[in-house]
């Protein structure tokens, strides 16, 4: 096993990994877009079953609907008094484009890409039930702002039914928090008992917006639904799956969500409640819904009751999301190597806490990872050197046994045993290192902290490609130099040509990779060159040849 062959193996494994991810990525279908009016809403009917019939989408009476804005230090929400839905969510701490002032818009009521968070009360007496239609709430103000010195801002909206039952819907925004409280207070001033059921759902256009489609050379981030239940910590539920079969699951606690790269919106019911999860693709429209229904609530005449829920609408911040609901942090999807990627992300965060630069933190993490793997690297090159020393004896065996493959294999095994050489010793370390690299790949790809994070000089955003392609070119040059300094006994012309083009192929691939990932690979190559130089000197002192 020569280092060139190992480089080929790394390249093939890595390219295969990317191709597999691209093949497995859940891409949404692309039907013709449908223009949708902002007043259209889909609301579930009450009950504990999974049936979700469509109900009235009209507001009560002829009262004029209004849009109310509420802002904290990290969120700006727009609320529609018809139904009390969140029809817009601006993430004030995250800009749409690097260097610009316009905030990133996660929720929007724009017809070309509708994405809203809806909630209400259905049931026998629910204001959003089929018999009632959607209510139009009243609010004292049209604008609410978290003031200096305040920890939270509350937006109360009220509606009173024909029997005198007062429904107050409150939105609670806390300082520095992307979890929005959505609560109902029910004051039954009527002479009859009232029964209601809370629902919360996310409604989104299925077709992927152009700004989320990514590049063909980079594995696409998942966009679609997801949920967590008692027996399933984290499960994606794609738009295609919603088309094939509606989600119908009853569970204690849990959450339902819509995911995209870096950001997520998720309804988190009370952990002690038994909730019903559902999904639906609206017939004839390019829209999908995922949501939940809470247990029925009975309010006796003259009594009061309160129903609470949480809506996360923001970036994928693992530490904060874990406090909102169990396993909500798993929406930062590291794939099947999550158990490696999570510690790597934690280390990256720790390093950033010291240096306050994500690029430098990546370099520090690379140094640590390659340092830990140094014994494997040394074992790899030592095994390669021992195999090289056996080349004359292996050539003699080939000459001795000719085309007799059975005797040739037997002779080689006896030689390896006698010389205490593991023929796979140069390959196994590579196979051990690949899962670490793949996990680190996803740790960097999924980290919202790297979005718009500067490094140095021209690298102002580690989450996108190098605008001048300097890092990919340097990475390719370092790979070429590493290849040149490595010994070779490859005589097959095809393998030689493949080896010559490997740095070019990798350079081309990395032109579109995030600068943070390219930085990791470049630093890793430089470390490999340094380690290889040190190891070769040590081996030569022991009489093991490192050059052919």
From Swiss-Prot:
GO terms for cellular component: plasma membrane. Interacts with the Sec translocase complex via SecD. Specifically interacts with transmembrane segments of nascent integral membrane proteins during membrane integration. It is a multi-pass membrane protein. The gene is yidC. Keywords: Cell inner membrane, Cell membrane, Chaperone, Membrane, Protein transport, Transmembrane, Transmembrane helix, Transport. It comes from Aeromonas hydrophila subsp. hydrophila (strain ATCC 7966 / DSM 30187 / BCRC 13018 / CCUG 14551 / JCM 1027 / KCTC 2358 / NCIMB 9240 / NCTC 8049). Required for the insertion and/or proper folding and/or complex formation of integral membrane proteins into the membrane. Involved in integration of membrane proteins that insert both dependently and independently of the Sec translocase complex, as well as at least some lipoproteins. Aids folding of multispanning membrane proteins. One of its GO terms (molecular function) is membrane insertase activity. The keyword Ubl conjugation does not apply. This is Membrane protein insertase YidC.
């Amino acid at each position: 096993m020569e280092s060139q062959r190992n480089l080929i193996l790394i390249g093939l494994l890595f390219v295969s990994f990317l191709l597999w991810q691209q093949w497995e990525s859940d891409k949404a279908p692309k039907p013709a877009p449908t223009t949708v009016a902002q007043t259209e809403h889909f609301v579930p009917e009450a009950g504990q079953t999974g049936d979700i019939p469509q109900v009235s989408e009209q507001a009560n009476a002829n009262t004029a609907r209004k849009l109310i804005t509420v802002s904290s230090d990290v969120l700006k929400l727009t609320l529609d008094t018809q139904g009390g839905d969140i029809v817009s969510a601006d993430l004030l701490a995250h800009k749409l484009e690097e260097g610009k002032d316009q905030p990133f818009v996660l929720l929007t009521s724009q017809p070309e890409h509708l994405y809203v968070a809806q909630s209400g009360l259905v049931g026998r007496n629910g204001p959003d039930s089929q018999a009632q239609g959607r209510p139009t709430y009243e609010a004292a103000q049209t604008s609410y702002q978290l003031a200096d010195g305040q920890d939270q801002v509350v937006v109360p909206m009220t509606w009173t039914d024909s029997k005198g039952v007062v429904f107050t819907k409150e939105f609670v925004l806390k300082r520095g928090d992307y979890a929005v409280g959505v609560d109902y207070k029910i004051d039954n001033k009527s002479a009859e008992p009232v029964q209601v059921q809370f629902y919360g759902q996310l409604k989104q256009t299925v077709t992927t917006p152009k700004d989320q489609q990514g590049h063909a050379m980079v594995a696409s981030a998942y966009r679609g639904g997801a949920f967590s239940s008692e027996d399933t910590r984290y499960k994606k539920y794609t738009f295609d799956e919603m088309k094939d079969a509606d989600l119908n699951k009853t569970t204690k606690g849990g959450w339902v969500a819509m995911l995209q790269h870096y950001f997520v919106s998720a309804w988190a019911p009370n952990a002690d409640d038994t909730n019903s999860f559902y999904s639906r693709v609206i017939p004839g429209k390019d829209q999908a819904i995922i949501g939940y229904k809470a247990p029925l609530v009975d309010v006796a005449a003259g009594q009061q009751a309160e129903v609470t829920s949480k809506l996360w609408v923001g970036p994928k911040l693992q530490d904060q999301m874990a406090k909102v609901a169990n396993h909500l942090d798993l929406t930062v999807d590291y794939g099947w190597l999550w158990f490696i990627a999570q510690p790597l992300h934690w280390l990256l965060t720790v390093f950033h806490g010291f240096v306050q630069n994500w690029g430098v933190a990546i370099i520090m993490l690379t140094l640590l990872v390659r340092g830990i793997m140094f014994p494997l690297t040394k074992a790899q090159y030592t095994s390669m050197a021992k195999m090289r020393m056996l080349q004359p004896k292996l050539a003699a065996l080939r000459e001795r046994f000719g085309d007799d493959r059975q005797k040739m294999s037997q002779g080689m095994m006896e030689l390896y045993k006698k010389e205490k050489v593991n023929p796979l010793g140069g390959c196994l370390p590579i196979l051990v290192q690949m899962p670490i690299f793949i996990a680190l790949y996803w740790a960097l790809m999924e980290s919202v902290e790297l979005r718009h994070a500067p490094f140095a000089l021209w690298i102002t955003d580690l989450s996108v490609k190098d605008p001048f392609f300097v890092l990919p070119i340097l990475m390719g040059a370092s790979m070429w130099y590493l290849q040149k300094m490595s010994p070779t006994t490859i005589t097959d012309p095809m393998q030689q040509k493949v080896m010559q083009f490997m740095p070019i192929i990798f350079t081309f691939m990395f032109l579109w990779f995030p600068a943070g990932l390219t930085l990791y690979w470049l630093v890793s190559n430089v470390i490999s060159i340094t380690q290889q130089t040190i190891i070769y000197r040590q081996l030569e002192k022991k009489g093991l040849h490192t050059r052919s």
